[in-house]
A protein has these predicted regions:
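N-terminal Rossmann-like NAD(P)+-binding subdomain of aldehyde/semialdehyde dehydrogenases
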Residues: 1-102
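Conserved small-residue-rich beta-alpha loop and adjacent elements
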Residues: 85-146
């Protein structure tokens, strides 16, 4: 049993180290670079062919929901989320109150941990991912145990 726990801890430590390394690559990105990256993330799952493949895989793997619902979530929710946040400032000075001599700076936090629910594993990881990357963070998404 303790070997299983040790192996799990080592596995998680490796994931976190790899995620930190990935985050370091984007922590100095400009707003334009961040926005291009999250656009690419959404396109990678919502593009023709891939959205269908993910929807079918989700149905086969979870035996929950229906294909059309999964496909539409990938197509609509990922794009809608992108449109909701694409114009938000997330790099550098994001708010300024000169009369009080206050500036609010956006700064990456690092590695974020998240769960993907078994009922919505097709859109949730990319939506959580674009929110994390918008702040120049990395994310590890784990499936919810079923």
């Amino acid at each position: 049993m303790s070997q299983d726990i040790g192996a799990a801890k080592a596995f998680i430590a490796d994931l976190v180290a790899r995620s930190r390394a990935a985050q370091k690559q984007i922590e100095h990105y400009s707003q334009e670079q961040v926005d291009a990256l999250i656009r690419a993330m959404v396109w990678s799952v919502a593009r023709p062919g891939m959205a269908e493949e993910i929807a079918q895989f989700t149905i086969d793997e979870t035996e929950l929901g229906n294909y059309d619902g999964k496909f539409l979530k990938i197509q609509r929710k990922t794009r809608a989320t992108l449109l909701d946040i694409i114009h938000d400032k997330s790099v550098g000075i994001i708010e300024e109150y000169p009369e009080r001599n206050i500036r609010i700076l956006a700064k990456p936090l690092g590695v974020i941990g998240a769960l993907a629910p078994s009922t919505n594993p097709e859109a949730t990881p990319v939506i959580k991912g674009i929110h994390a990357v918008k702040g120049r963070n990395s994310i590890i998404v784990a499936p919810h145990p079923r």
